[in-house]
């Protein structure tokens, strides 16, 4: 029976780039495994967690035995946030890729490789906006509402939610952080 390596993370895990990510090296060493990745450069830990839970749930609903699933999660920086917007908010935010890239469009944060807004369910509209500390898009949020402590608490909650889900479903997993972002736990 086919086995599944399901991974998620940020650019360090993303498999769309020119470099070979750790997950591609790992699946080469795991005979009989296929690789499923929803990693995306700059995405935060909320979308990483949700993407893993969605992908594992889909495999289980399709009859895959939990023992045939291995999950690898690379946690991103705790200052990376994601927000689910409705159609009106997306329109107000003017998040329109056709308007151009970072330098020519102050309302966006793309530099040519990032998908924003994005999503983790392939059949659903992409309404999750990812943001980072240095992006113009989220400048007000980070100045007024974000702190390193908040980022650490949110990251720990995403980690726990993911662990609890995987353990409840008897899924083998490994987790690691690519940044030393949990300074305040």
PLM region spans:
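Serine-esterase "nucleophile elbow" of acetyl-processing enzymes
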Residues: 1-55
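Alpha-helical cap/lid subdomain in secreted, periplasmic
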Residues: 54-185
């Amino acid at each position: 029976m086919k086995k599944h390596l399901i991974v998620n993370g940020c650019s360090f895990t993303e498999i769309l780039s020119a470099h070979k990510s750790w997950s591609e090296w790992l699946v080469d060493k795991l005979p009989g495994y296929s690789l499923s990745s929803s990693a995306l450069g700059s995405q935060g830990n909320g979308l990483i967690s949700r993407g893993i839970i969605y992908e594992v749930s889909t495999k289980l609903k399709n009859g895959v035995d939990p023992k045939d699933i291995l999950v690898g999660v690379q946690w991103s920086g705790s200052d990376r946030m994601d927000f689910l917007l409705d159609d009106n908010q997306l329109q107000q935010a003017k998040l329109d890729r056709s308007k151009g890239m970072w330098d020519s469009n102050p309302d966006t944060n793309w530099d040519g490789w990032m998908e924003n807004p994005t999503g983790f369910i392939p059949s659903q509209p992409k309404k999750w906006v990812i943001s980072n500390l240095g992006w113009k898009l989220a400048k007000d949020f980070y100045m007024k509402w974000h702190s390193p402590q908040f980022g650490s608490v949110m990251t720990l909650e995403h980690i726990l939610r993911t662990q609890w889900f995987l353990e409840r479903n008897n899924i083998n997993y490994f987790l690691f952080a690519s940044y030393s972002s949990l300074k305040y736990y």
